[in-house]
Amino acid sequence: MKLAPWALLAVAMAWGWAFVIMKDAIQRQSVNNFLFTRFLLGTVVLVLIRPQVLRLLNKDVLLRAGAAGTFLGLGFIFQTLGLARTGAAITGFVTGLYVVLTPLIAWLVLKQKVNSFTWSCIAVATVGLGLLSIHGFSVGIGELLVFISAICFACHIIALSKWSSGRDVYAMTVVQLFMCGLLSGIASIPGGYSPPPDASVWGVVIFTAVFATAIAFIIQTWAQAHMSPTKVAVILTMEVVFAAIFAIIFGGERLTLQSALGGILVVTAMYLIVIKESK
């Protein structure tokens, strides 16, 4: 499907922008509270736009989308726990390792073969992620928690590639977002829930809920019915590149030679995958 890789690239762009605007918001609201509000609002928006989707929530959709949403929700929670214990740059790199974990898990679980061209793109993307993110590295509990999140994100990509085809994309997305909200809500219980403290944070919540959550996951769920999980993972690594670009343009961050080289490598890997997929 020629449109699918470009649609996923748009998703990566939305997530990259969300990463930049969330930085200030999660300083003023706990991350789990932010995620709970974001995913709950995203679910409500989807249901309000198309209320008849509730009739499509049969056992098959609930089980498969619920499982995919559980992987996604756990990924966000473990990533958050790790982020509290290690640096943001290292968190970005370790999370991005799902580009390596996705084909490995797909090979082990689904027996999907990965050709040498795709493995080459994976290697290039991984090196690029490292150059973009790493400025010193040590392995501790934070890094291990983030690595678990990368496994969860890889499992989410594989689950969507396995279960999206032949099922209603909208219904699948609603259930996934609900599961993420439910898990984030449970994670918020120990510290209690507090709503966004001001209009600025509410603005970020609304943007991420509508564009980086509801619309983005509809596109991802649809696109993955037409692409292999490994190629999806490589394209989605562009989130890190877009985040860096937006941070430089709008956040006043400085572009280093190392970051530039890393970005070029990730873009190269993504471009090769997209061009091959579009043929």
What is the predicted role of each segment?
Residues M1-A10, T43-A67, R85, L108-W119, ...:
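Membrane-interface interhelical linkers
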Residues L46, L72, I105, V114-S133, ...:
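Hydrophobic transmembrane alpha-helices of multi-pass small-molecule transport proteins
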Residues R28-L74, L101-I105, C152-A159, T173-G191, ...:
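Transmembrane alpha-helices of multi-pass small-molecule transport proteins
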Residues L9-I21, I49, G66-R85, L131, ...:
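Hydrophobic alpha-helical transmembrane segments of multi-pass membrane transport proteins
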Residues W6, A10, T37-L41, A67-T70, ...:
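Hydrophobic residues within alpha-helical transmembrane segments
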Residues L8, V20, V31-L35, A65, ...:
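Alpha-helical transmembrane segments and their helix-entry boundary regions
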